[in-house]
Amino acid sequence: MAKLRSATTTEGRKRAGARALWRATGMTDSDFGKPIIAVVNSFTQFVPGHVHLNQLSELMGETITAAGGVPKEFNTIAIDDGIAMGHGGMLYSLPSRDLIADSVEYMVNGHCADAMICISNCDKITPGMMLAALRLNIPVIFVSGGPMEAGKTKLANIDIKLDLVDAMVKGADESVSDADSDQVERSACPTCGSCSGMFTANSMNCLLEAIGLALPGNGTTLATHKDRKQLYVEAGARIVDLCREYYQKDNQEVLPRAIANKTAFMNAMVVDIAMGGSSNTVLHLLAAAQEAGVDFDMSHIDALSRKTPFLCKVAPATPEYHIEDVHRAGGMMAIVRELGKAGLVDMSVNHVAGSTMAELVKKWDATDPTNEAARKFYRAGPAGIRTTKAMSQECRWDEGDNDREHGCIRSVEHAFRQDGGLAVLSGNLAVDGCVVKSAGVVDDMLHFEGTAVVYESQDDSVEGILNDEVKAGDVVVIRYEGPKGGPGMQEMLYPTSYLKSKGLAEKCALITDGRFSGGTSGLSIGHVSPEAASGGAIAYVENGDKIIIDIATREITLALSDAELEARKQKQLARGKQAYKPLDRQRYVSSALKAYALLATSADKGAVRDLAKLEELS
């Protein structure tokens, strides 16, 4: 039987001081000996996806207490990528993932907590907590704050659904009137919750269901809906059960590394590809696999992408469907079910819910006419009322979406596309690979040949696009924005949004060693590895070079001979200490960001810390 970690601070006469401090937090004699559950919250008033998370604390605490645990809450930081977008604030977004992971480790190990409930929601917070959970390897359940309702308004007498990206595109489109732009802005983000499309936050919260660390409905039940209360209650009770399983029965199969094993990572990636998840998920799953000690890299993702169909097309790939529609169609359990029918995922894996994936999928099958609980659950829908209050409405669709031929979630036979929504490309421009969200690429752009227009920073690219330097047929190349070169690997949502506003989204490509928001669509290729700052070939591209992109063959090619590439390499090396650094870029880089850059690896490694370099320095 494993001993409670918290016994280190609660047992024996020599721990009188620690117990005295615990008593000052409200603990009593009856609490000592119970599992201490760290309620890892991320409430902040800066982020709509987190603005309501303080409303969950009391509920979670009451549930854990009733189940026989002792809840102790602390908070992490949370950066809103949408607000940090397009200025120096975005440099801090990806580095915050590691800071969050470290802060969770510090708090949990510093106080010897026995288990964790991770209340996350947005882009880097869920991955950061996931890294910590796999690093610590103690019982854990993730519960997100839930997705935002899709925005809705009427323009030109047409009812339309909206999200954050629409506000950005309309705001940059000079042909849109001030009144229409203002109307879209005011309608795009109507409630608390993570932004309403298949963007990074929702992608990660959905994948936690698929990898087995979050309960069904975690990724798709709206933040405003009362059904989330039951999700939180079940999670609070279940985490105490997991503590009993591990600490009293020595059942190590309930630990996160046992659940999120290689098979589970492969399952999650298949689901990710099938649902057209954000390309950032590749970055985060690679990083999480390293923390879990799982052999999972770009080659696995490439192989899976070639055989996984695209089953769920959601904004930003289409304006027709948002996350609320995915829930109506049966959520992640429905996608897993369709993939399972085709033998594309392993249904025997375990789950924090206490069953195999096969059992869980059957339990939550909303297509079963006799399964009233599942059918009701997946009909939870939006209320259309502006609010920041969680669990405040109980509207339901009149009926679910079980149309697997024409609906939001398709069967394999009726897939939107037989190759999936994410693809890994490689070639002389990206020897270690790069990633494209192919779900957002129109068929006419799956093969593209264009002329390079090179920028040394995102800021310069935005200025160039808005000043009409980019024309149809061009390939915008933005470099020195990788993990080390940025530093911080900024998202390029503004450049892609401005290409849309200029009518070039389906006429140009964009390539970067940075990354993209989950809200990006179009032929947007990121995570180019090695990055420019690490000597990658993207550093050698010059204006006017021909670049060939072929998603079907998974190739990306800079049309230069090996001899010319070598000549350009020597030209770069001749710059001495300035080699592989941007020309004339004016950017303040703080000591915190310099520390991040010192250990950052390229995107193909998940942009994690270079542990070999860390060992050299220690």
Curated annotation (Swiss-Prot):
Biological processes, Gene Ontology terms: isoleucine biosynthetic process; L-valine biosynthetic process
Name of the protein this chain belongs to: Dihydroxy-acid dehydratase 1
Residue numbers annotated as active site: 517 (proton acceptor)
PANTHER family documented for this protein: D-XYLONATE DEHYDRATASE (PTHR43661), D-XYLONATE DEHYDRATASE YAGF-RELATED (PTHR43661:SF3)
EC number(s) recorded for this UniProt protein: 4.2.1.9
GO cellular component, one term: cytosol
Co-factor: note: Binds 1 [2Fe-2S] cluster per subunit. This cluster acts as a Lewis acid cofactor.
Pfam hit, one: ILVD_EDD_N
Pathway the protein acts in: Amino-acid biosynthesis; L-isoleucine biosynthesis; L-isoleucine from 2-oxobutanoate: step 3/4; Amino-acid biosynthesis; L-valine biosynthesis; L-valine from pyruvate: step 3/4
GO molecular function, one term: magnesium ion binding
Disulfide cross-links: none
Swiss-Prot/TrEMBL catalytic activity: (2R)-2,3-dihydroxy-3-methylbutanoate = 3-methyl-2-oxobutanoate + H2O; (2R,3R)-2,3-dihydroxy-3-methylpentanoate = (S)-3-methyl-2-oxopentanoate + H2O
InterPro entries, per database record: Dihydro-acid_dehy_C, DihydroxyA_deHydtase, DiOHA_6PGluconate_deHydtase_CS, ILV_EDD_C, ILV_EDD_N, IlvD/EDD_N
